[in-house]
Amino acid sequence: MLLAALTLAWLELRGPDIPYEMLEAKFADDATRFVDLPGGLHVHYQEEGHASLPLLVLLHGYGDSYTTWDGWVRELGRQFRIIRLDFPGHGLTRAPCDYVLRGDALAEFVDAFAAKLDLPQFSLAGSSMGGSVAWQLALRHPDRINALILVDAAGFPNEQSPVRLPIAYQIARFRLGRVVLRNIDNQSLIDDLLKADVYDKSVITPALVDRWAEFQRAPGHRTILMSADPTTLNNASAPVLLYLQAPTLVITGDSDVVVEPASARKLAAAIPGAKLIVYPHVGHLPQIEIPQRSAADAAAFLQSRP
């Protein structure tokens, strides 16, 4: 039955790649930058704000892109120099099709990016997968980071049953499902996934869904996305997190079904001195659901530091 359903989905929904040139023509703007890193990586990032301002680097989550932070950039652009980048397999970043999404590799990717740009010490915020990469980078290269903001960050494994997850997550748990997802125009699955991610469904607009779907159809992206190893993202442990030196703010929504609020509380409890904010009636993406409030809390935290 599963095989028949997946075969039908592939036949009905398969969609071709969208060339990078077309995506860049549509989405690039005055803030668009690119830098090349070893391993065939052509990294897209956006840089906004005056160079004299404190530096804030933003990391998106799995399947997302730099655009997830649009609301924060609007709110914080006059207070911070902001750099937001696309991970391999995401957004406008080009990567070899055999790139494997692992937490440790992504942390080293961000470190290499920071070294290439010769960035000074910076504050780092990460959403979901990007949150896991953020705390892993802070452990591996503590001298780079002066503050951490973990937004519904992966860290400790959930205890929830897979049945509670949206269909896209359930399909991706099976090898055959991942093969199907590599080849389809997954717009309807993305709509399902994003609406499950948030409490306020109205924030998931057709334009947002279209953007996710178009970026994921960049050459090689769907293959890279299906390579993700969640065990390298949900691998936090209290003894290891004790070594985190950076002041840390943990943000979560009480209606998050992707990273359970209990996991966020556990993460905050394990990090020395971490502050925790739990938003009522908010899901997995507070930077999209409540951009003004979450950005204000982020700014207050960063500005409270000496």
Please annotate each region the language model reported.
Residues 1-54, 79-80, 120, 303-306:
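Alpha/beta-hydrolase fold catalytic core
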Residues 15-16, 22-23, 161-165, 181-242:
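Conserved alpha/beta-hydrolase catalytic His-Asp/Glu region
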Residues 38-39, 46-48, 87-125:
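Active-site loop/oxyanion-hole signature of alpha/beta-hydrolase fold enzymes
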Residues 48-92:
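Conserved HGGG/HGGXW glycine-rich cap/lid loop of the alpha/beta-hydrolase fold
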Residues 139, 148-178:
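Flexible "cap/lid" loop of the alpha/beta hydrolase fold
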Residues 244, 250-252:
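Short beta-strand/loop motif that positions the catalytic acidic residue
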Residues 255-259:
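Acidic catalytic loop of the alpha/beta-hydrolase fold
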Residues 274-306:
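Catalytic active-site module of serine/aspartate enzymes centered on a nucleophile-bearing elbow/loop
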